[in-house]
Amino acid sequence: MQRSLEIARLEAQIDKNWDAYQKIPRRKFIGARTQEYRFAQYIEDWRIKVERIGNLNYPDEARRLQIYGKLQLSVAIRADGSVESVEVNRSSGHRILDAAAMRIVRLTAPFSPLPPDIRKDTDILVITRTWTFTSSDKLESE
């Protein structure tokens, strides 16, 4: 009898753990050199939009003070195109540029919803890119 109760308790715990596990979002991490075809067009469209908005909103203070540099940024995009998070992985060394990159992501959002072929196994797409604020006052992403 005691053994049956213990087995039932363990089965209930396993079910609870499994349910919790199923609720964890499936994340896919993509860098600049991704080889998977199904991500290529989405990433390219994302890059074009970010650079267009970034160049329209290039930080005036950086331009005025002639501050240039590179930083690495990760942007987590939900399936509906909204931004879950933005994180500076490697700073440019200039607070102005790091803050500008995060601001540009917020201005650019929302992004296009993830296409069905990506959504089939991805709930959150994390795009990591190097952003360069150039001496010609342009934003480039690689």
Regions found by a protein language model. Give the residues of each.
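Short, small/polar residue-rich loop motifs at catalytic or cofactor-binding pockets
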Residues: 67-71
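Short Gly/charged-rich anion-binding patches and loops
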Residues: 45, 57, 100
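Conserved "boundary/linchpin" sites in short secondary-structure elements
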Residues: 1-30, 51-54, 78-90, 99-113, ...
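Surface-exposed patches in mature extracellular/periplasmic domains of secreted proteins
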Residues: 58-63, 117
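Soluble non-cytosolic domains of exported or imported proteins
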Residues: 4, 8, 33, 37-44, ...
